[in-house]
Amino acid sequence: MNSIKFPVLDRTTKNSVISTTLNDLSNWSRLSSLWPLLYGTSCCFIEFASLIGSRFDFDRYGLVPRSSPRQADLILTAGTVTMKMAPSLVRLYEQMPEPKYVIAMGACTITGGMFSTDSYSTVRGVDKLIPVDVYLPGCPPKPEAVIDAITKLRTKIAREIYKDQIRPQQGNRCFTTNHKFLIVRSTDTGNSDQELLYPPSSTSEISTETFFKYKSPVSSHELVNSGGV
């Protein structure tokens, strides 16, 4: 039985009949089935990868690493998030099914870290792009700290209310080269052929109207090697 305390689930009758609610039952079933998305951009991910070994054995918490965002409900943003990587991170988050959770792992993810000083290409805080449930500071955090963050997230899940599990649909955060973040329309348009337009050299901001533009299909090689910051 899970050690997380449930106010209603813990009330039992003399005949050992458990009385509970839909909220507690749903939360209890998800506590031991968090499937994290393997997402790492820097050295913090090495500490997270060490949890898979037998020394820390994070399988005991029911964590099953997934390579597809459509099969994951937890993402640990481990490492530096660059401006060019930001749209991909937002898209991965949008492809995850609800309810979903985010753990910001490391100083570079939370504030930009040492790369945030006079840097034009680093996002200064992943919470400007996606909502964060647990902040895990460190450079890098130890595996024990990651386990503690997961424990705190499990405690938060145990206290959730069913109607609050589905977050309201929000506009995504658009970014500019001078670190001004704007709210734009959703990037999950269902069109796999859309191409990201980077700002021209004559301006420092990405227009909210031309953030995404539908163009003729392009190869992934051309898309990756397109000009930009």
Curated annotation (Swiss-Prot):
Gene Ontology terms, MF aspect: 4 iron, 4 sulfur cluster binding; iron ion binding; NADH dehydrogenase (ubiquinone) activity; quinone binding
Topology within the bilayer: Peripheral membrane protein
Cofactor note: Binds 1 [4Fe-4S] cluster.
Broad class of the protein's primary localization: plastid
Entry cofactors: [4Fe-4S] cluster
Xref: PROSITE patterns: COMPLEX1_20K
Catalyzed chemical reaction(s): a plastoquinone + NADH + (n+1) H(+)(in) = a plastoquinol + NAD(+) + n H(+)(out); a plastoquinone + NADPH + (n+1) H(+)(in) = a plastoquinol + NADP(+) + n H(+)(out)
Enzyme class at the top of the EC tree: translocase
Record keywords: 4Fe-4S, Chloroplast, Iron, Iron-sulfur, Membrane, Metal-binding, NAD, NADP, Plastid, Plastoquinone, Quinone, Thylakoid, Translocase, Transport
NCBIfam families per the UniProt record, alphabetical: nuoB_fam, PRK06411.1
Function: NDH shuttles electrons from NAD(P)H:plastoquinone, via FMN and iron-sulfur (Fe-S) centers, to quinones in the photosynthetic chain and possibly in a chloroplast respiratory chain. The immediate electron acceptor for the enzyme in this species is believed to be plastoquinone. Couples the redox reaction to proton translocation, and thus conserves the redox energy in a proton gradient.
Assembly information from the UniProt record: NDH is composed of at least 16 different subunits, 5 of which are encoded in the nucleus.
Matches recorded under HAMAP family: NDH1_NuoB
Annotated family: Belongs to the complex I 20 kDa subunit family.
Full protein name: NAD(P)H-quinone oxidoreductase subunit K, chloroplastic
Organism: Aethionema grandiflorum (Persian stone-cress)
